[in-house]
Amino acid sequence: MSRTIFCTFLQRDAEGQDFQLYPGEVGKRIYNEISKEAWAEWMKKQTMLINEKKLNMMNVDDRKLLEGEMIKFLFEGHDVHIEGYTPPSE
């Protein structure tokens, strides 16, 4: 059975996560406030960040940087800035 939540990112009701995807207090907030659709958007941005900035998830500093970008993207309305990336024109 799916959960419906008010998604902070999308600013509308949407299907919530099936389980907590991220540890700690940030994870609880994501579970309660971020929809599957918004999380999928973040996953695309996260992949781009890891690849373009050559982040190593074994490195604590790189993980902290990624977590900071995630919080800014999901909760503060900031888009992820990736140097040299130009989105495809529609």
Swiss-Prot record:
Keyword line: Iron
SUPFAM superfamilies: YggX-like (SSF111148)
Pfam families: Iron_traffic (PF04362)
GO molecular function, one term: iron ion binding
A GO BP entry: cellular response to oxidative stress
Signal peptide positions (record): none
CC terms in the record's Gene Ontology section: cytosol
HAMAP family attached to this UniProt entry: Fe_traffic_YggX
Function field: Could be a mediator in iron transactions between iron acquisition and iron-requiring processes, such as synthesis and/or repair of Fe-S clusters in biosynthetic enzymes.
Family assignment from sequence similarity: Belongs to the Fe(2+)-trafficking protein family.
Subunit structure and binding partners: Monomer.
Name of protein: Probable Fe(2+)-trafficking protein
